[in-house]
Each structure stands twice: as C-alpha cells, then as structure tokens.
Amino acid sequence: MEQVNKTVVREFVVLGFSSLARLQQLLFVIFLLLYLFTLGTNAIIISTIVLDRALHTPMYFFLAILSCSEICYTFVIVPKMLVDLLSQKKTISFLGCAIQMFSFLFFGSSHSFLLAAMGYDRYMAICNPLRYSVLMGHGVCMGLMAAACACGFTVSLVTTSLVFHLPFHSSNQLHHFFCDISPVLKLASQHSGFSQLVIFMLGVFALVIPLLLILVSYIRIISAILKIPSSVGRYKTFSTCASHLIVVTVHYSCASFIYLRPKTNYTSSQDTLISVSYTILTPLFNPMIYSLRNKEFKSALRRTIGQTFYPLS
C-alpha cells in the first residue's frame, strides 16, 4: 500500500538561479547577448569555411563541425533557460527533461570524440605531411565524424535510459538550470551507488577514452617535432596545435570537475557556476580560439566579406 500511495513525478521545478531572484532580468540580458554572440560567431565561421575553397581541408572541416556542434549544444540549454528566467512557472516535463539530458549528453560526448578526431588530424598533418591529403581524404573525415556521433549517441542513450528508468517519487525541485545527470539523480527515490556508476560510465566513455586518444596523438606529435633541427621550425609546427590544446584543456578541465570529482565536496551553486562556463562560455570562445589565432582563416574571412559586400570591386 505504501508504494501505491506514492506520487509519481511528472514534471520538475527548475530552481536554477532562484537564489538570484533580483538579478533575473539582468541575467536574462547577459545570457541572451552571449547566446546571440555565440550563434553569430559560429555561423560566421561555418559560412566562411563553406564559401572559401581554400579552407576546404580536413582541419577546417572539423572546425566547421565543431561550430555546428557548439550551436546545437547551446540550443539544447540556453533558450529554455532564458524562458525560465522571465517565467513565474519554471518547470519542465518529465519527458522534456529526458530529451534535454539526452541531447545535452549527445552533443557533449560527440564534442569530446570530435576533439580526439581533431587531434588525430593534427598528428597526420605533422607526422605524415607528404601523404596527409591522401590519408585524410573526405571519406576518412566523414568516417571520423560519424564515429564521434555514434559514440556520443551510445553514451547519451544508455545514460539517459538508466537515469530515467529510476523511480521518481520524492521531491521534484531540480537545483540546476537544466537537466544534468547529478541534479536529476539526486531526485531519484532509489539510487544507492547508481549515481556513481552512471557518472563513471559517462566519464570513461565520453571523457577518459577521447583524452587518452588525444594524449597518444600528442606524444607522437611531440616526438616528431623534437626531430626538427630548427627551433623556429619546431615553434612554427607546434603553433599549429596550440589552439586545439587550449580548447582540449578548457573542455576536459570543466567536464572533469563536474563528472569525475567526489560529489560531497561541492555545493549545487558551485556546480551551477561551472556548468555556466562550459554550457555558455566555452561554446562562444572555442571557435574564436581556433579562428582568431589562424592567419589563413582571417584572410579567408576578409575575402568572404569582400566578395559578399563588394562583389564588383
């Protein structure tokens, strides 16, 4: 009889930034501007790569895919968050929460494997420069992209299914601004040891394995660079990897802090702050890190702007 009388959770109350009630409108304006800027910068990068044939190379192919990923990644979270900031009723349905978690994990996990593919691309460019165009043909690039998406789909499907098969009979107050794994698991009626298992699975398949692949690529890259006799040549060669290394460092630092650390040492407000950094800020800065440091891309952008606005000049 006790089980029958329990109320099944059909929606979650998204508390998010409720502790900052007086700043809701200010946060809305800030996050809206950041979101629009993210969409704009990534759209510019994608269109420049598509329109300029000089950028039709494996490295820029992956950069365009990365920008597409960032747009989708933020679209899953930010619009709903903006609506909640201005709404009195800050809720999300049970199904909507599951869809949001699946989508977020899919794009986030695919992003990790995409970074591994980009590391492999840098390895092939530096260690096999003469055969690079053959070894990294269109078919190989498409295959790496498909593999990244397949891995992301598997991780997100398994993890989301396991989480939402748990019984939810207790509180429905979600202490976060979107349906991330840990905040949702805290609301499950039974999850003894299960939360650690799910997070471990996510960490291994979506973080540890891609990171190991990246490390293997860079061990070989560094080994090849050290064989270059000129210090100028070594610096110039390694500089082609600098942007990728910065993005990898930021991505894995934030993700590891959220998913691979002991949960008892940090509050939900600290989790929210870190989550803002990797769901809103990194999608804005990642493509910019790649493009602004790249002279070839900046030249292509100037050509594209010139051909678009001054076609007859």
From Swiss-Prot:
The keyword Lyase does not apply. The chain crosses the membrane at residues 26-46, 55-75, 100-120, 140-160, 198-217, 238-258, 272-292. GO terms for biological process: detection of chemical stimulus involved in sensory perception of smell. One of its GO terms (molecular function) is olfactory receptor activity. It is found in: Cell membrane. One of its GO terms (cellular component) is membrane. Pfam families: 7tm_4. Glycans are attached at residues 5, 265. It is a multi-pass membrane protein. PANTHER family: OLFACTORY RECEPTOR. Belongs to the G-protein coupled receptor 1 family. Odorant receptor. This is Olfactory receptor 10K1. It comes from Homo sapiens (Human). The gene is OR10K1.
